[in-house]
Swiss-Prot record:
Entry protein name: Chaperonin GroEL 2
Location in the cell: Secreted, Capsule; Cell surface; Secreted, Cell wall
Annotated family: Belongs to the chaperonin (HSP60) family.
PROSITE patterns: CHAPERONINS_CPN60
Gene3D superfamilies cross-referenced by the UniProt entry: GroEL, GroEL-like equatorial domain, TCP-1-like chaperonin intermediate domain
Residues the record lists as binding ATP: T29, L30, G31, P32, D86, G87, T88, T89, T90, G413, N476, A477, A478, D492
Length: 541
């Protein structure tokens, strides 16, 4: 395919137009008075959301250079969402401000590499300042406040805090759709481990990139599964039972994997293959934990069991299994409660008798997985559109609360970034690096200014007032008052704020140092078929 090439200022401005198109759509959602964005779907009802990454993913631009610019800033939102679970809109606003200021300096003749180095040093300093000023999350109320800000709903924040209180900070919290109105919290036996599906073809929900199995059988194998003849007798029995199958093995490869994938694509049989977590003896122990939790047995030659002679009675069961690309959650395994309690007691004894800190840590992880359970938040709403939007908000808020527990919290509302600006004076940079640091200085005000603008206030006036206020004091955009934001319960996890800034700076550096852009040449649309005599094509007279 033919390519089109743009150089120098033309290339950078093309990328910036794409970035601005995406950022302008995303930034209207920032803050408590931010608006929603409606996303058209090819099938089904439209989605209404105020989540930055969901909006960013939907934007496809026609101009090839603008398209690349939008894709680059999409990456900022995606990366921030992956790392911290929130802050995608803040990251987009920061990226736009950094690129706008940076390109102005490049156009005036500044060296892009010097600017990039200055930006990197300034971001490192601000990150260090944010981490130093972070307050540890100690109370249930602090968790509730942080989650409530992310979800824009205090009742959601309270429920998430209660869920974390029940299952612990490392516990698993899942969100499900409910047929009733309102929110409910249920505690179930369950486990989550850090291994996802082996092949993307197993996905059942393309939008969320998840494989969801309801009431599945669970096959646990301690070795590799590669030949289909070993698996076939058992597969036939499972198909007859009419249930999906989750396979957890050392690995699933070759014809065994292709058989499962082909049957899934054809709709003949729903299954998911996942690698077992851990290595060596720890893998065996974790497989045994899963067997006890699900009421199954591990198929292993060590205990005289082989895959080709395995019966359906050796399979475990669960109410539901959710598999993403990175992790697997088993909800409500069908294991005997006495057997689970016995296994928990055994692991506790091993922890007491262990001399190694590493072994003790890994045993604690196993104990948390087995004993912690899974908190299920069931969300209901009047319409399907509202339900999807609400479910998404709750999932974001759960990740936000976990990030807060992990690294602590700072004042929200863009105030922590603005109050970190004086730390840049300590850098003592010169020349273009100092200009790079000044670009960051200007950009750090952007989130607060956007929150003020969305709240119908004058951004410059608000920024000036907050700049001259004591640390942690800022605008509560919901009420229009200036107050101590942490006391008012307006806090952001420092992990979210830090990730947003680091990812925005990373992309801004790439924008500034770009000197040429190579893109696919847009194809001209073919003329519609017509009658060579001049009549209308496709008509019978």
């Amino acid at each position: 395919m033919a390519k089109t090439i743009a150089y120098d200022e033309e290339a950078r401005r093309g990328l910036e137009r794409g970035l601005n198109a995406l950022a302008d759509a995303v930034k209207v959602t920032l803050g408590p008075k931010g608006r929603n964005v409606v996303l058209e779907k090819k099938w089904g009802a439209p989605t209404i959301t105020n989540d930055g990454v969901s909006i960013a993913k939907e934007i496809e631009l026609e101009d090839p250079y603008e398209k690349i610019g939008a894709e680059l800033v999409k990456e900022v939102a995606k990366k921030t969402d992956d790392v911290a679970g929130d802050g995608t809109t803040t990251a987009t606003v920061l990226a736009q401000a950094l690129v706008r200021e940076g390109l102005r300096n490049v156009a005036a003749g500044a060296n892009p590499l010097g600017l990039k180095r200055g930006i990197e040093k300034a971001v490192e300093k601000v990150t260090e300042t944010l981490l130093k000023s972070a307050k540890e999350v100690e109370t249930k109320d602090q968790i509730a406040a942080t989650a409530a800000i992310s979800a824009g709903d205090q009742s959601i924040g309270d429920l998430i805090a209660e869920a974390m209180d029940k299952v612990g900070n490392e516990g698993v919290i899942t969100v499900e759709e409910s047929n009733t109105f309102g929110l409910q919290l249920e505690l179930t036996e369950g486990m989550r481990f850090d291994k996802g599906y082996i092949s993307g073809y197993f996905v059942t929900d393309a939008e969320r990139q998840e494989a969801v199995l309801e009431d599945p059988f669970i096959l646990l194998v301690s070795s590799k599964v590669s030949t289909v003849k070993d698996l076939l007798p058992l597969l036939e029995k499972v198909i007859q039972a009419g249930k999906p199958l989750l396979i957890i093995a050392e690995d699933v490869e070759g014809e065994a994997l292709s058989t499962l994938v082909v049957n899934k694509i054809r709709g003949t049989f729903k299954s998911v293959a996942v690698k077992a977590p851990g290595f060596g003896d720890r893998r065996k122990a974790m497989l045994q934990d899963m067997a006890i939790l699900t009421g199954g047995q591990v198929i292993s030659e060590e205990v005289g069991l082989s895959l080709e002679s395995a019966d359906i009675s050796l399979l475990g069961k669960a109410r539901k299994v959710v598999v993403t690309k990175d992790e697997t959650t088993i909800v409500e395994g069908a294991g005997d409660s006495d057997a689970i309690a016995g296994r928990v007691a055994q692991i506790r004894t091993e922890i007491e008798n262990s001399d190694s800190d590493y072994d003790r840590e890994k045993l604690q992880e196993r104990l948390a997985k087995l004993a912690g359970g899974v908190a299920v938040i069931k969300a209901g709403a009047a319409t399907e559109v509202e339900l999807k939007e609400r479910k998404h908000r709750i999932e974001d808020a759960v990740r936000n609360a976990k990030a807060a527990v992990e690294e602590g919290i700072v004042a929200g509302g863009g105030v922590a970034l603005l109050h970190a600006i004086p730390a840049l004076d300590e850098l003592k940079l010169e020349g273009e690096e100092a200009t790079g640091a000044n670009i960051v200085r200007v950009a750090l005000e952007a989130p607060l200014k956007q929150i003020a603008f969305n709240g119908g206030l004058e951004p410059g006036v608000v920024a000036e007032k907050v700049r001259n206020s004591p640390a942690g004091t800022g605008l509560n955009a919901a009420t229009g008052e200036y107050e101590d934001l942490l006391k008012a319960g307006i806090a952001d996890p420092v992990k979210v704020t830090r990730s947003a800034l680091q990812n925005a700076a990373s992309i801004a550096g790439l924008f500034l140092t770009t000197e040429a852009v190579v893109a696919d040449k847009p194809e001209k649309a073919a003329a519609p078929a017509g009658d060579p005599t001049g009549g209308m094509g496709g008509m019978d007279f």
